[in-house]
């Protein structure tokens, strides 16, 4: 009988922890406190709560982030993995298609067009792989279930909501990397805010669809970080 009681007790305890661990984000105190303290997110508080209610944790994203190739591999291994013949071919085609803008960026920012093209290739294979993770799910998980970097990702989450609001995007549909980066150049939300620029003259910054905006934004990012032409990059 005592054994049965212990099993029942353990079952109830396990159930309690499951409720705590898997509580909906819109019901968690830490999430609601963040929401209360966050500056305007564009969307109303009720809208944000609704998005959070539809978002589930993605625990697998933490080991993916921790074991990212750029964190684990030496340059030789990283180069072997990313600098492939197919990617080089794409790079040649990309540079040919966007020669005029790459040359313009080199002239106006000092960043070599070949460097801009190379970064677009490394980051997303020239837009072919801009990430398949739901960005809201990633950022919410990393904001509240990854304590070591929670403050950083909470800033990204807030900026992600502002970005979606300003561009008319559905936060539930946006996809990106395991770190919440989006677009051909893989900009995290705060970098999107600070460094993304309009490259095609349509008075709109769109790193999800405009290659011209991505080219200009990559160049601007490097220029704003004091890119020095001819300096060693490795």
Could you describe each region identified by the protein language model?
Residues 1-154, 159-175, 180, 190-234:
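Cell-wall glycan-active module
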Residues 186:
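Functionally critical loop-and-helix segments that line ligand-binding/catalytic clefts
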């Amino acid at each position: 009988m005592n054994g049965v009681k212990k099993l029942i007790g353990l079952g109830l305890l396990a159930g309690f922890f499951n409720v705590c661990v898997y509580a909906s984000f819109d019901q968690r105190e830490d999430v609601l406190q963040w929401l209360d303290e966050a500056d305007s997110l564009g969307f109303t508080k009720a809208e944000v709560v609704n998005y959070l209610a539809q978002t589930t944790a993605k625990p697998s994203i933490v080991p993916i982030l921790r074991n990212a190739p750029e964190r684990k591999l030496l340059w030789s291994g990283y180069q072997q993995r990313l600098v492939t013949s197919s990617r080089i071919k794409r790079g040649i085609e990309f540079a040919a298609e966007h020669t005029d803008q790459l040359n313009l960026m080199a002239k106006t920012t000092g960043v070599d067009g070949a460097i801009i093209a190379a970064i677009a290739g490394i980051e997303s294979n020239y837009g072919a792989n801009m990430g398949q993770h739901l960005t809201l799910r990633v950022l919410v998980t990393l904001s509240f279930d990854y304590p070591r970097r929670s403050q950083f990702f909470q800033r990204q989450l807030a900026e992600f909501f502002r970005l979606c609001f300003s561009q008319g995007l559905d936060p539930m549909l946006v996809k990106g990397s395991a770190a919440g980066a989006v677009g051909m150049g893989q900009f995290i939300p705060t970098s999107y805010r600070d460094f993304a620029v309009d490259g095609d003259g349509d008075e709109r910054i769109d790193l999800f669809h405009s290659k011209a905006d991505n080219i200009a934004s990559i160049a601007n990012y490097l220029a704003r970080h004091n890119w020095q032409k001819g300096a060693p990059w490795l």
